[in-house]
Amino acid sequence: LEKKERIIGITSLRLDSPGLAVGTAKGVIKRVNPEVLSSKESWEFINLAPGDEVVGAVELANEDLHLVFITDDAQLLHYPASAVRPQGRAGSGVAGIKCSGQARVIWFGAVDPEDDAVVVTVSGGVDSLLSSETGSVKVSRFSEFPAKGRATGGVRCHRFLKGEGALMLGWAGAYPAIAATDSGAPIDLPAPTGKRDGSGAPAPQPIVAVASRHLAHPGPGGETPSAAASTDLLSGGVSDDQESLGQPELL
């Protein structure tokens, strides 16, 4: 990997797949048509604006999945994948979520609205680090969050307590979810009884990642892909450094 590069997802590159869905820190969404360049080992799949970076990439099983954004100012937006027209790899994407002020997207993925899905949010101070502050954690049913139109602001998904000012982590996916510390030790999460815009409860330890215990959604042919979608991978949000990580590539 190049300096400041990190892996954010895995795809099968199946030509019969609905393709990748990609979300960026500044709220851009892009669906990428499946394409394999046999003459190259890697290639770019989205043109990023200065200061932007990809925070999530997921291979879609079908267009019934909902694309989900979670921002650091506790807004959540989701809508069907069919609301976004696929583009070729040279495209720059379209507005996915309207971020207010200096807010940034900390998580992007895809969720089956028919699943027993949940939303996990962890709040803390504005300058808090995932690995050092426990923060407040909340688990809510995904069904609590109404779908909204693309490029809107979404709905509030977490109420901050005194001393809190941002989400340190956000995640949505199939229930049950599991959390982990920076050493990989599992952390029990509360039951999914949190109100849509309620506050969280003190986390027992700093949570740096959340994932589903379920496998990825079946692929276009009905089989489960060998590579999990981003909704099923441990995810700790955007990088600590908010500078652009360069143009993302498929390898």
Regions found by a protein language model. Give the residues of each.
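Short, structured "edge-of-domain" segments at secondary-structure transitions
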Residues: 1-251
